[in-house]
């Protein structure tokens, strides 16, 4: 598990910014999406992406990492909100709807990038204020590329 830390650069000086809880999950999502490439190394593609009538959900953020792997980012303010289960649900949806994601990449970035999507490295990033020991253990047991990130 990793923490997201922010720093302010002034000339040759670097200062870590103090962390604080966000009031709303949407605030956290907005800040990460606005800086996704810098914070996560992921190119932002879509926010609140609808999963259709069958799944009836919305993926918080979709992106593509520097290796061409699809990335789902799910956000929660608190640790007890089943972010991992929800993320796995959307990960399953994404792997079942590769053509739809490929079309999104084609529209946002271009055909060449869409043709070289690396599905074997599909990632799920769960961002929350904290995770419990059961979350951390569960992620180790699941044979998927899942990252837990705490914000402060």
Regions found by a protein language model. Name each.
Residues 1-152:
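Charged, terminal alpha-helix-loop-beta segments
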């Amino acid at each position: 598990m990793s923490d997201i830390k922010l720093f302010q650069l002034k000339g040759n000086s670097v200062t870590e910014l103090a962390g604080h809880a966000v009031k709303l999950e949407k605030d956290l999502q907005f800040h990460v999406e606005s800086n996704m490439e810098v914070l996560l190394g992921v190119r932002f593609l879509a926010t609140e992406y609808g999963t259709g009538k069958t799944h009836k959900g919305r993926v918080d953020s979709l992106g593509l990492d520097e290796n061409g792997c699809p990335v789902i980012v799910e956000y929660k303010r608190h640790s007890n909100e089943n972010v991992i289960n929800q993320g796995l649900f959307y990960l399953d949806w994404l792997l079942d709807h590769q053509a739809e994601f490929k079309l999104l990449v084609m529209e946002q970035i271009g055909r060449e990038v869409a043709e070289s999507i690396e599905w074997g490295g599909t990632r799920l990033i769960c961002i929350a204020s904290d995770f419990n020991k059961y979350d951390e253990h569960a992620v180790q047991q699941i044979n998927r590329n899942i990252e837990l990130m705490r914000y402060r």
